[in-house]
Amino acid sequence: MFTKKSHADVKKSTAKLQDSKKDSASRLRHLRMILDNVELEESKCLFETNYSHVYFILYDTFIQAEANLKQKVHKAHREELDGSLWLLEKILCLLPELLARRWQCHSLSRIMAKLLHLGNSPKLRREGVRYFLLWYQTLGENAPGYVHAMYADLIPGLIVPQKGVVGPDTEFSASDFLTHPNMKADGGMASVFHDNAFSHPVQSSEVVALLPPSSSEKSAPPDPRDGLEVLLNSMVHTAACLRWRDNRAQKDHRAFAFLLQRFMDVFLPVFSPNFDVSCSIYNPRLDLPVMRSINKKEEVMASCVVVLINWVSRFTHERLLSHRLDCTLHIEDVDQVRLHGYQQGLIVRDVLYVNRENINFVHEVYRQAFLLNFTSKPQIEAIRTAIAVYRDWMTGETPPPFLLEPNDDPPPPSNAGGTPRSQRLRTPSYVGAIAGSKDQLVVRAGRQNVLQVFVTNAANVFLVNTANLNICFPTRSRSYRSTPLEEQTEICKKVLNVYRTMVMNTEMDTRTWEQLLMVLLQVTSIVLHQNQHTLPSGTNKSATLGGILGSAIFQTLIVTWIRAHTKVPVNVLLWEKFLNVLQSLTHREELIIEWNKTIQTLTRVFSRYTYGINLLDLPLDRVAESRAEKRRRIGSVWQGSGSNSAANGGSAASAAISQNRQRESLAESSSSRSEETSSQVPLPNHPRPHHQHTQSQGGTGHGTRPIPLTPMLSRSYSEGSLASAARSSRIRRRRAATPKPKALQPSQLAENRINPQDLRRAMSLDSLARKGDAEETDSYQEGDNESGAGSRSPSPTASSGIEGGSIKDAQLQIDASLDDANSGSYGSGSNSGSISGRRCIILGGSAEGWHPDSTSIMWKRMLGALGDVNRIPKADLHAQVFMHLLEMTQNLIKIKQNQGISTDNQNTQPMPPLVPPIGIVAPWCYGSLSLDRSFKKGKLWALQLLCSLAIQGAVNMQQLPLFYHALHQLLTGEDRDLIYAILKHLEGPRLLSLLLPGHTLLLLDLVHASAILLTSLEVSRSTPRAEVAALLGSLLCYPSSLLTRSVLQPTPQKFELMECSDLQDHILNIVLRCARREPSAKARCIALSQLGQWLLMRLSQPLPASNSGRANLFQQAVPHHKDVHPKASSVYNPRIKEVLQVLLQALQFKHHTIAIVAVDSLKLCAERGRQLAAIERVPQLIITAICKALEIQSVTKPKDSDKVVLTSLMLCLGEFCMAIPAPIMLTPFNEQGDTLVLQVLRVLLQVASGAPRHERVKLTADDDFDMHIAHDDLQGDGRLPEATYQTSETIQKCITAIKLCAKAVSMHLVTHIGHFPMGIGASRLSSMVEEQDDIGNAAYGGQVETRRDSVELPSVVSAQNMQLFMLNSGLVASFIELPTLKLPGGGITAGLVTADKQVRVLMRDLNGKACWDASILYSEPRNAEEPPKTTPKIQHSQPLDSMATSMVTHTPSPRHTLRHRPAGVLPLAKDMAPDLDQLDDMLAYIGHTSPECVAPTVSQLNAPTASPLSGNQEAQAISVILNQRLLEQEFVTHSTQAPSPALRHASSNSSLQQPDQRSLHSTTASFDSLPTRTEMPFQYCRLLFSHLGLAGWERRSRTHLLQRSEKLMRELRNVDLQKCRETHKMAVIYVAAGQEDKGSILRNTSGSSTYEMFVSALGWEIDLETHNGFLGGLPRQGCGATAPYYATPFLEVVYHVATRMPSDSSEAMLLKTRHLGNDEVHIVWSEHNRDYRRDILPTEFCDVLIVVYPLRNGLFRVTVNRKPEVPWFGPLANESVVSGACLATLIRATAINASRTKRAALPLYQQFYEERNRSLDSVSSRYKESTTFEDFASRIYNPMPLSTLGTLRESNASSSAAPLASALLDHNRASVKGWVQASIDSGPIMGIAPSASAGSTAAMEAATGMSSASPRGPRKLGAPFKSVTKKHSLQHIAVGGGAGAGGDTPPESPTLPQRRFK
């Protein structure tokens, strides 16, 4: 499109250019045209050929333009000047060779002077500076002096002092002019260049401004900053502009180097007088910076320094150059201007890097940046720039040449941005000029020197005080202006972050590490001290740099310190300085906070590397959790500490490692530390692409072992001195000294190397899966990539600078920097064995990273970094330190507790040889106790720490005197807070169970302090009232033989012994007062429980033990028989009554938990009822008090908690009534003759009836007993059931339950008082007899035998010798007539004349089931020898009348044979005679003597009234009766003479349903079996029923028949299964020494002798196969042969003893585990040296865990661990010390109360009597049969007539085809009155006409006969009575299993199964 002109045109223009006749303007125009149409080389040739013409044109046009501009400034004139300047630039650029020889030097200097005039416009002057620099660099060193002077004036306002005499060639002197040959003419002094008017040469005109500034341009005074900026920019713009003929690139660089050198020589000393040219990075001077002040004079030129810094950073900042290169190379048609600009930048950078002087200049410029004073915004930005440059140098991929090591090969060619450079930008000549010589190696200073220089120089930003500067800087937010302090703070944060980047990511040598440490120490010391002392005391922390950055500075210092010791050996003198600095700054809270973070993190690493335990993922926290299995499948790094058992790489291993790291990274971060997944030095908001650093691999990858830097730098601190712990512990064991190891000194560690195999070394995450040297590098690189892309490796700092706010959120990732800590170098060798032999750096070896020895040493050193913590001046910081020490100690305790934990819970691991130094800080604790009162808070923490050490057994024999002395002084001192702290943290009785040598010396001190606390009114959660009560309670029940009489005298200043024989009496007084007036609920409960224990012990041991040997080590109170009485000579403690009265008074407490605890404590004594009876009036006191408490606790609207209290009281009352001997209960105790039984029944009746009291019951008067609780600290525990609100329904439920309990207790007492246990034993309260027992012999003559455990009982349903009654709503009676049973010796009727049948009555009620066998008694043995003569006759003609059966004697005389007295004679008793009727005579006497009493219609009182019937009617009735009598006599005679089948009439024709042949056969057989008796099968039962008065009309409303059916029998079986007592089942587990896993514990088949004694004392052994009581779900076979069992009249307990159950197979182990795991209460006997844990036998149950630990002194430590939802219970509290005499009793009572409390807390839980009552109600509501009196009487006469029997048989026969729905719909329908049909059928035979009523009933039955029985389908429902295989005493049978028995098996009840408790 555009073309240049032809060659001919160029020639024409050239000719015109050379034509001197043309005007200069035309020639200039032709010259421009020529240059526009030729190449640059041709242009240069043109200029060189016509240089004279060209310069003439320049000068002429310039002079013309100057002249025109002087006249008037016009646009055309400015254009003329622009053309001249264009030509000037062309001459300067194209003729450098001529100009270098000073061609036209003077002329050009005049032009330049005019252009540089200060009066010119700024634009023109900038152009002039550029032209001058082009000319000046061309002249170079050949420039004359005046040119150099012109250069010195380039910056206006900057005065450059003249440096002495100017050189001889710079100017011409006057003499030179005069002596010059040209100045002389012929014979005279005249000259053309000489003015004759004057005597001197011609002078040049004055230089004036060419183009003054316009009015729009400001005429401000010149600013040196602007001039310097113009100069520096022009230096860059003029670079590479000269077109040299040869060696252009070299000359370009030389030209710029000249300008730069001139700049440094001329201007730099002027505006930066502090610029130190002697500073060198090749031999750096590393003097530590000091505090500096702000000099106002220096601030004047600071802006110029800022300009220089910004200018240098443009060419040394890698990122800026990369940006230019990227922009240039991505454009195809590169613009020459842009390309030229890029070349200029490269030239500048190359010149800056070309030699050492220039490189030093660059670093000195940046040093000046760090010395700026934050007084302006540009200064702040310059500092930021300097920091960014150094950061990019350290992290960039292409380092500058001075960063390269002098001996290393140059790095592979690559540019900063990652894009290959174009080769055309680097010509061969350029490469040869710059990098082709050995000079390039000279500039290499090495990375370490640069790092040292930066570390030293950058510290200057901290060392200037800007807090007093009253300056504000604008920000992006218009509403906020920042201050110099804020800006300095941000800059310091950036420097700290760069320091951290170096620590984390940069390889540094020893000198660099030490310099960094020294600089940080200097900064820490100066900044924090300076801010502390120069500001007023009340200054806010945010007003000082140290206050803002104190935490960050301390953290950086500490982390760098620890990191350095894992990388390089550090001079010991630095440690001393470090300690001095930290100790001098202990008044700063930031130091304490960071020190604590360091210690806590070091403790984690210490735990991980030394003991193989991750504190953030403890083994105890993982046990018994499902997630633990997943973690174990992934693999725990810490378990194979010295092995090489990890997976061999691969993706699975990498994924596992990544997951572990991510979990640890998240877990170890705290709220104050932000964990970032990609950066361990967090720099938020500026993400940087991830780079893999070759330096992080150690700088090389050629055969050497790579040292992982970047990915390994993210671990946490660790704690230590444990390499020595193993060795020292072995030494102590050899010397038989205390087993607690102590850390050795580092010198000892260095001298005595331990065996590497003894250390449990933990391999790092990145050192997994390495087998040999061949795989080493790849494995590491995999680890690096994993770490970099994952979560734990620190990335480089962000690309665009560090955010100022990152420090606060970052905290240097102290966990990360120490937790990883190059541990890979520890496990990165060819195998673990080779690595374990290497010594760590801190011990003088070469192994980097964390090792057990390095972690232990570093942990101990950092622990002591603060020096003596008791010298901390501030009390609050002193307390804070001890609080942190306590946290650290608790972590050490966790480590100890988690050592040797089995991961699979199948085998117990041996204890490791290393033990954490728990007591390492004990000396500090003792020292703190001697401080003054202002340090009280710290002393409290120290006391807690000491007590924790004592509890953990970390107080050795050497420390015990100090420990006792400290406790003695504090316990007897005046400071109650310290006293309370000791009592609280000694954990009450835990101190007694520790068995510390000589601990009994402190008993009186403890009692004294406890009395002070309990008598105080201070009630809060921090006051240890409960712990003190438990301690005193344990001492109260302490065996006197173990209490030494010598104790310390309770005075603070004395340490003397005294005798105290009455210590326990003193304790008893305190406990009694606590039980009476304690304001804390929990302490009151504990005191009451301890009083109960004391009572039990005193009743069990009435006399003190005469011998104190081991004979009394373990005495148990085994339950004894009721006939065993205590010795009469027993003497009981006289204070038993006083203690009893306190317990009885507590029964009236309205606080429900306290009342229940009092009940439980009192119930302990119920087992000692006979001992209590031996004490005068104690039984009356107890019974009366309980009855009174019942009345007081009764409320009109009870809640669930009231119900629990009242039921507990009533059951306790029942227990005492059963325990106290019956004679005492039946003995009157007052004048009215009331007995205790009467009083009890009266109260129970009142409760059961719910009768309101007419008078208010008042509490028992006791002025010393406080019924109020000021502090209910039981709120946090589980609560008794309590509804949020009450409704009438909930109130009624509670009332019903309370009444039912009273009824059950009263019935129990009526039945069992004086009889328990009966002959069957204590395991059975109810009869085991059932309806089917002995029926087979009675009904079938022995042909068919029914079995007890059979559910298929059709014979029971159809038996005619049995009837079921409901005598009232809660009483079901079964009357069964049986043949007289043959008993050994004749039984109770031996020798008496009885009938050959007996009556069995089974009664089921709330109290259980009772069985009574009754026989009719005819005569005594003497009468039986002479039987009456009428006996044979009666036997053959005995009527069916039930009353006649008893007439075995002569009938009395008839009524009319009696004599009568005269009417006026008074019948007296002395005149009685057998034939006189006293009542008849009395009536006659009254009527005779008092006629007014005789009615008008009656003549006398003893005469009958007139009959309402007529005489005929009376005669008719008499006739019917006589006929009936005659018929009966004939029937008897007929049946006796002809013994035919009695029920022959059943086969007669009838319209009713006929019975089947089976029923006829069974009925016939039943009568044939009685050949000697012909009475009905139910005859004697009917007789007894009448004798008992049950047949009377007055009882008709309460007595009902029950519908006989199989469902009823099942319901009765269900009633029998309901327990009549409270039942509990508990697990008993034995843990032998060395057992801590489930497998070994469950495999125990026996225990120690003490354990066996304990188990035997819990109850008595029962045989599971023959036991007839509660079994707790144990099968009779398969779970052992015996089990311990215990029973009282109101409860049963069975123990699932693990050692009794077999464990020889996996099935047996599974069964054992199920039985034990399903128990709610576990009793564990542990002889292991560590505490038993719940997770050893994991289960969803085990709500309460009771563990017994035998102690060496014969006592037992008991811990009670309950789940949070379980309410408080007694008598044993957690951490109790109990003697062996009452151990089993207390454990049993505690376990029972625990089970009872757990159940009471369950919603909708019902007691045993409620369950039984519900079953009885179910029977009465479902099966009660409403009948008329006639029907009722008939069913008594004949329980099962043939009609009913047939109907029942037919319904059973047809049941197989009927659906279940019919049974569900019709099961409540009334049965057919079959007995009516039987009487009708028997009418013709008997000769009796059926009555009308009987006929109508029969007709009704006939009409409904076919539909009366509801058919039932064959489906069976799962019910509690489902047929199962059961063990019978004679043989083992299976019911309902065969096919043949299917027809006789009745269907199961369609009702749903009821809930059962076993």
Swiss-Prot record:
One of its GO terms (cellular component) is nucleus. Residues 640-656 have a biased composition (Low complexity). Residues 1612-1819 form the Rap-GAP domain. Residues 775-785 have a biased composition (Acidic residues). Residues 1-21, 400-424, 635-804, 1534-1568, 1903-1958 are annotated as: Disordered. The keyword Phosphoprotein applies. SUPFAM superfamilies: ARM repeat, Rap/Ran-GAP. Residues 788-800, 1546-1568 have a biased composition (Polar residues). The keyword Electron transport does not apply. One of its GO terms (molecular function) is GTPase activator activity. The modification Phosphoserine is found at S718, S764, S767, S787, S791, S793, S795, S1551, S1949. Residues 400-414 have a biased composition (Pro residues). The modification Phosphotyrosine is found at Y980. Residues 758-774 have a biased composition (Basic and acidic residues). Keywords: GTPase activation, Phosphoprotein. InterPro entries: ARM-type_fold, Rap/Ran-GAP_sf, Rap/Ran_GAP_dom, RGPA/RALGAPB_N, Tuberin/Ral-act_asu. This is Probable Rho GTPase-activating protein CG5521. It comes from Drosophila melanogaster (Fruit fly).
